[in-house]
Amino acid sequence: MPILPILIGILHLSLAEDAKHLDGFSLPSLPSEHLIRYLNTFPKLKQQLPTNLTGKGTISSACWGHERDCTPAGRFQTPQCPGEHTGWARSKEAQVRTFYNQADFGYIQEQLSQLTPQCVPTYLGDSSLECTHYLRFCRGRNLLFDFRGLEQREERIRYHMDVLGPGQLLGHCKLNRTRLSGEMEHIGSALQSWGPELRNFDVLPHPVLESGLCDVVVNTPTFIMKIDATYNMYHHFCDFFNLYASLFVNQSHPAAFNTDVQILIWETYPYDSPFRDTFKAFSQRPVWTLSDVEGKRVCFKNVVLPLLPRMIFGLFYNTPIIQGCSNSGLFRAFSEFILHRLQIPYKPPQQKIRITYLSRRTKYRQVLNEDELLAPLEANDKYDVQRVSYERLPFTNQLAITRNTDILIGMHGAGLTHLLFLPNWACIFELYNCEDPNCYKDLARLRGVRYRTWEQRDLVYPQDEGHHPEGGAHAKFTNYSFDVKEFVHLVDGAAEEILSHKEFPRRASENPSKTQRNEL
């Protein structure tokens, strides 16, 4: 059965009033390929849809990749590992499998296989707690967090490992203390594990909700997040990406992608970030911080402690990647999910390659001959060139530009994290990596877009040796000029790669559904 009519049918169905609520349940807002897999995950929900819309064959077998019965043919995406296998893989199959387990839905499958009960309920209203290895992801029911001690803290809390003390995290369940204490190896840093918090877990003699101890009962499912730097896009998207991955680890109920959830940030600083709109992809509620609950004993009916931004061998940050592979389906799914939920418009390419140049307004890593570099590109009829300073634009406006860019050019810096939201055929051109060669190269591999950077060291001209604030020369703390001819050569090469990409539209009139998935 052709996929496009099915997707269009689902589109119309999802917009129809009688399909918005299936037995009182609303279908989540997801891109079409995501929605198909969501429905296959919950067959009872799928059975409520007309059979001509749920499809057969490739549609009925479509899966994400972490499911036990998911076949390689049904996966959301298979990694690309061209050429001979290299490194420590013994075969091509082992190379693909290694990448899939390191950075794709295989990683989700591993987390699911590790979920182990730490505190087991006896009766229906009891508490529960289960976690993956090293307490990197946990979820619980009917748990009491005692935040009364925060009122006496003089300092603001961020990256603290002593937010909770002994007996300030309670549940009524059978606690396996030996098992829980055996998972405390990764507590050297606040952002590596939930161990600093869970080491204080203790047992109440009575059910939490009947104990009379709850000052506040939170009925809304809650994600408690320990987050990285909020003003740095690269680091804050470590948070958002791991939150998205955690939705799959927690996907035991059709409400897994529901936005009626509460986000609680594990610090007392007011939450502020230029990227704060991204939380709207996950929750329709205002973000809480510890300041919203301090002084209270808060009982959560359903609480998730999601994957953390700086886990050892984690996702996004500190991700080990086998050589020779790219195109993580999990990273592509994250990109499509955010663009869909934030309703970022898509415009198919026309006759020209769309080039976006990120102009820095910071003290360091400015391009001193910016005008000279861009002049020949602007004079070329093949290119549509725009120069932008993203720090001056709302984040959703930034995404609207990035999503409709074919070549994104910029100096080494957090703004290059926008490569996550480029079209599949696009190229990220890190003008100069400032002697940090792997950060955005690896991120481009994970997302599955082409990557280029400056190679001719004799054709880049630093203003000086660079002066690190703590002393010594440093390539990130100076400004640069570049050879114009070599710059144009690199851009032309990137354009040729884009034009030859199998997903790049060959004609302006070509249906964008062939390259960018239809969305609901």
Swiss-Prot record:
It is found in: Endoplasmic reticulum lumen. Its EC number is 2.4.1.255. Its cofactor is a divalent metal cation. Glycans are attached at N52, N176, N250, N479. Disruption phenotype: Defects in apical extracellular matrix. Embryos show defects in the formation of the innermost layer of the apical extracellular matrix and its attachment to the epidermis. Most larvae die during second-instar or second/third-instar interface, but some survive until early third-instar. Surviving larvae display cuticle defect and irregular tracheal morphology. Ultrastructural analysis of larval epidermis reveals disruption of the deposition zone of the endocuticle, leading to separation of the epidermis from the chitin layers. A motif (Required for optimal activity) lies at residues 292-294. GO terms for biological process: larval chitin-based cuticle development; protein O-GlcNAcylation via threonine; protein O-linked glycosylation. InterPro entries: Glyco_transf_61_cat, Glycosyltransferase_61. A motif (Prevents secretion from ER) lies at residues 517-520. PROSITE patterns: ER_TARGET. Keywords: Endoplasmic reticulum, Glycoprotein, Glycosyltransferase, Signal, Transferase. It catalyses: L-seryl-[protein] + UDP-N-acetyl-alpha-D-glucosamine = 3-O-(N-acetyl-beta-D-glucosaminyl)-L-seryl-[protein] + UDP + H(+); L-threonyl-[protein] + UDP-N-acetyl-alpha-D-glucosamine = 3-O-(N-acetyl-beta-D-glucosaminyl)-L-threonyl-[protein] + UDP + H(+). One of its GO terms (molecular function) is protein O-acetylglucosaminyltransferase activity. Residues 1-16 form the signal peptide. Its main location: endoplasmic reticulum. It comes from the Eukaryota. GO terms for cellular component: endoplasmic reticulum lumen. Catalyzes the transfer of a single N-acetylglucosamine from UDP-GlcNAc to a serine or threonine residue in extracellular proteins resulting in their modification with a beta-linked N-acetylglucosamine (O-GlcNAc). Specifically glycosylates the Thr residue located between the fifth and sixth conserved cysteines of folded EGF-like domains. Involved in epithelial cell adhesion/interaction with the extracellular matrix by mediating glycosylation of proteins in the secretory pathway, such as Dumpy (Dp). This is EGF domain-specific O-linked N-acetylglucosamine transferase. It comes from Drosophila melanogaster (Fruit fly). The gene is Eogt.
